[in-house]
């Protein structure tokens, strides 16, 4: 983490410097894969009665897929959680998070080590993720990191069950950070080129487990060199 530049003094006690902010993604940075998508696929498999409904919705799903991948995922998520309301949902994500963390190969040792190092150094660590808020928080609770700040996608209970209210993707991450008073950071770690808007806030952009081609595209998008790390 050497060579990071501290951000400008921000709000809080007058004259007191703000803690340096470090942003981390979750998917393929701290946890391998996309936990929310794995969870939703498990819910679809767990209730066979949903499959006829899924087949009946295929034409609609194809239309959603043409509109955007994010909309398709939101629709599939709504089908996966049909009839699952808030209390049941919380129980399910708690169980899923516990199982995920028990599988030691599901988490990046190097990523979690870097996150803990930042916290020990007094930096303000914020995890910014497309994963659903309660699921992400449950994962960190199981990791013994319940104090980590999490800014994530928002799902709400409705008459038919849980449904996505706000997807925390791309530029939306920057808007969500701004709503929490965060407009710059000393470093941002991510594995996805969708996070270019978030990387633009960072003095140091760090690409996790990216290919050379991905690294070149990121540098072209940002207009400067980035750091590439290989985490296991």
What are these regions (language model features)?
Residues 33, 39, 84, 138, ...:
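Surface-exposed loop/turn and secondary-structure junction residues enriched for glycine/proline
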Residues 23, 78, 162-163:
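Generic secondary-structure boundary/loop-capping signal
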């Amino acid at each position: 983490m050497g060579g990071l530049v501290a951000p400008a003094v921000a709000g809080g006690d007058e004259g007191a410097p703000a803690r340096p902010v470090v942003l981390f993604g979750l998917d393929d940075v701290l946890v391998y894969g996309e936990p929310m998508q794995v969870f939703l696929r498990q819910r679809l498999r767990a209730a066979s009665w949903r499959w006829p409904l899924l087949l009946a919705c295929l034409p609609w799903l194809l239309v959603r897929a043409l509109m955007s991948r994010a909309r398709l995922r939101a629709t599939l998520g709504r089908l996966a959680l049909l009839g699952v309301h808030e209390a049941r949902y919380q129980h399910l994500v708690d169980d899923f998070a516990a199982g995920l963390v028990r599988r030691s190969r599901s988490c990046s040792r190097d990523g979690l080590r870097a996150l803990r190092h930042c916290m020990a150094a007094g930096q303000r660590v914020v995890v910014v993720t497309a994963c659903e808020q309660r699921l992400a928080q449950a994962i960190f609770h199981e990791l013994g990191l319940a104090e980590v700040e999490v800014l994530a996608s928002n799902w709400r209970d409705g008459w038919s069950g849980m449904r996505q209210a706000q997807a925390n993707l791309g530029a939306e991450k920057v808007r969500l950070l701004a709503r929490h008073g965060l407009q710059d950071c000393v470093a941002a770690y991510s594995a996805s080129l969708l996070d270019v808007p978030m990387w633009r806030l960072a003095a140091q952009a760090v690409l996790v487990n990216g290919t050379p081609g991905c690294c070149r595209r990121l540098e072209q998008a940002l207009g400067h060199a980035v750091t590439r790390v290989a985490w296991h």
